[in-house]
């Protein structure tokens, strides 16, 4: 193969594939270059010249850019398997993703990571895996599994593994927790991904000094700039709930691009269908005034180099032939996509080997009743979690709520309704209740087994009866999403693979999500993405007030607090 690449690059024999008649975006100079692009096997072998090809593709009037790289995501949050995610996202130009399977790992442990690694060997796109570092994320919740360093080391040398995934337990790092230290020491010299929302100053210095190189939780340009100036690559995030692109646009410049990359973290097929994936981030950034050279560098070459993938990210000889033919830099609509030199088609997807799903019957919660969700307050005021639309950071609020015969009651005029978390792994049967502000619900309940990071049942509702009905229905369908009103199911989407992923094609999941959103709106929901917004209310590593199966958590103090 090496001899063939040399001969085809030198023009001594026809290349396997030649893209002819178009221009490519040179991310070194920012120029649009008229040139053929020659490909041998999975590599680019020729640019800045004219080539003959065994197979020639006319791309007149089009522009070729490097394949896009999503540097941090949880495929499980797309609610489909890795194979279906491949079908969903690769045609939009995303040729490499760097995933953290900690959603399925929190439910199934090492079995979940193995499922992802097995799947990554069979997909058309290049799925790289970071080993989940914090399972569970904290001691303040009940997960289905625990991963210690001895559970991770058997996977460390897998060809798809880059390093250690987002180290969410930054208090544990700063406190030099022994298990945190064991994981960090084992992966020194390899890539360690970060997760440190609002961490600044000297504590940030200490965290970075543990060997952590990248971070995706910056929600302001000021925070992002501090992290970059201290040596981190900042991953600009725009997901279905966490929408930080607009706030970070001021630092997406040609000067800063080498220290930036793009990620989605959590993005579902409905948003991908309606808006796009990384292509949406690129279009949105350029429309907002970002220079194309800056955002395309962040989407490809800067992302690749941040994670040590030096074989991709440029349209240049010797680089992996991950290429996207787009209509224009501003439009960024993929018309042809090549992954490792292969033109993407349904036939290519159909030829993949399948991987047997895991994690069936993972919802082991006992049946609950309305009386399981009575709530009491120890003072005249009741704490409530304040939703901030488009953010996973929440507010810690207090309200004067009435006390009825069944405890503290919701107040619809104040947009305060009840929230509950039910342990679903069969460990202890914990149930915690609290209140939340910002959903807009006037009736019914919404429930989910997608509930970061331990993925217990999380329910928000206006009555204890509907909360119980929704929670029980999730057990009957092996997990997923449910919308209930007056005890009747208005819409549901089963996620039988670990209570996180569907066994259906992504098109079916997309359509089911549309029905679910409409049903949530019928209950009064004012949120653009109520289900993933609900999923982050139980995540006790994101400020400020959260709820787990063990109770309300003041994340700033890393302590439980009363209602």
UniProtKB/Swiss-Prot annotation:
Any one GO MF annotation of this record: adenine deaminase activity
Source organism, top-level taxon: Bacteria
Pfam family, one: Adenine_deam_C
Keyword flag Transit peptide: no
InterPro entries the record matches: Adenine_deam, Adenine_deam_C, Amidohydro-rel, Metal-dep_hydrolase_composite, Metal_Hydrolase
Cofactor: Mn(2+)
SUPFAM superfamilies: Composite domain of metallo-dependent hydrolases, Metallo-dependent hydrolases
Keyword Manganese: yes
Alphabetic keyword roster: Hydrolase, Manganese
Enzyme's top EC category: hydrolase
Transmembrane segments: none
GO biological process, one term: adenine catabolic process
Reactions the enzyme catalyzes: adenine + H2O + H(+) = hypoxanthine + NH4(+)
Enzyme Commission number, as recorded: 3.5.4.2
Family to which this protein belongs: Belongs to the metallo-dependent hydrolases superfamily. Adenine deaminase family.
Record protein name field: Adenine deaminase
Organism the protein comes from: Brucella anthropi (strain ATCC 49188 / DSM 6882 / CCUG 24695 / JCM 21032 / LMG 3331 / NBRC 15819 / NCTC 12168 / Alc 37)
Gene name per UniProt: ade
